């Protein structure tokens, strides 16, 4: 999904039609853009609900895997190919993509539920709080300085993808895997801020595609949630192993 994220980000940048001049525009958020943001976040909430349904379906029916991931990527590609004015169709495709993404993350969700269900709740709440804080920071900022993070974040994402590719070929240790997780978490937390301000700037330039913008934020949210969940599971597993060792000794 990280690979497709970089593809979708590049697609959006090419289609937006705005350049360096937009970075120097520090206008306050207009009422029209505020209404657009409300629609974006409402759509995001619905997509997250659909993703939760997908995760539940995996826990109940064990449907998540490579097929659902490919289906999710295919759905997102289909979404980009549908004209913007076909809102109902694109909204339905977004929900299908979110559901398939939830099913794809389902194995990790099930692992967390089987180990300790409180970890899942804590990870989701932590992600929601982080998302809310970083989003608010991006919205209330008077200057759009966070847009300048785009090049740095893109470079970081490229490094992350390269590390994952190298690990798939040469293998990796637990230490290198956790480095990828923490590094990826840092990158996608940055994207939460960057994407929010980019959405605002695009809206100021007439891009009111709330479905595409909701998809961008949905991808950020899931990427952060997965990494926080992995970190919490690893820490909980280490503590459990340590307790077992103490009992044996």
From Swiss-Prot:
Q: In which tissues is it expressed?
A: Ubiquitous.
UniProt membrane topology term: Multi-pass membrane protein
Query: Which UniProt keywords are listed?
Result: Apoptosis, Membrane, Transmembrane, Transmembrane helix
Q: Which GO terms describe its cellular component?
A: membrane
Cysteines paired by S-S bonds = none
Supply the CDD domains for this chain: BI-1
One example GO MF annotation:
calcium channel activity
List membrane-spanning regions: 39-59, 65-85, 93-113, 119-139, 151-171, 213-233
Where does the UniProt annotation locate this protein? Answer: Membrane
Q: Give the protein's function.
A: Suppressor of apoptosis.
Please state what the protein is called: Bax inhibitor 1
């Amino acid at each position: 999904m990280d690979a497709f994220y970089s593809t979708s980000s590049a697609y959006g940048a090419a289609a937006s039609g705005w350049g360096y001049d937009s970075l120097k525009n520090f206008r306050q958020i207009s009422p029209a853009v505020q209404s657009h943001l409300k629609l974006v976040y409402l759509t995001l909430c619905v997509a997250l609900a659909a993703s939760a349904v997908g995760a539940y379906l995996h826990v109940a029916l064990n449907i998540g895997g490579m097929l659902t991931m490919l289906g999710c990527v295919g759905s997102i590609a289909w979404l980009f190919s549908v004209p913007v004015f076909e809102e109902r169709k694109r909204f339905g495709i977004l929900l299908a993509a979110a559901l398939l993404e939830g099913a794809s993350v389902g194995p990790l969700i099930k692992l967390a539920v089987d180990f300790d269900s409180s970890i899942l709740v804590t990870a989701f709440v932590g992600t929601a709080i982080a998302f809310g804080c970083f989003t608010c920071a991006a919205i209330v900022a008077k200057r759009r300085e966070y847009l300048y993070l785009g090049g740095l974040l893109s470079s970081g994402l490229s490094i992350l993808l390269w590390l994952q590719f190298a690990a798939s070929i040469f293998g990796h240790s637990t230490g290198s895997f956790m480095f990828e997780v923490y590094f990826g978490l840092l990158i996608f937390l940055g994207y939460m801020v960057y994407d929010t301000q980019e959405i605002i700037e695009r809206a100021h330039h007439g891009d009111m595609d709330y479905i595409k913008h909701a998809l961008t934020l949905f991808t950020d949210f899931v990427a952060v949630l997965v990494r926080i969940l992995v970190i919490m599971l690893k820490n909980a597993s280490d503590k459990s192993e340590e307790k077992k060792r103490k009992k044996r000794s």
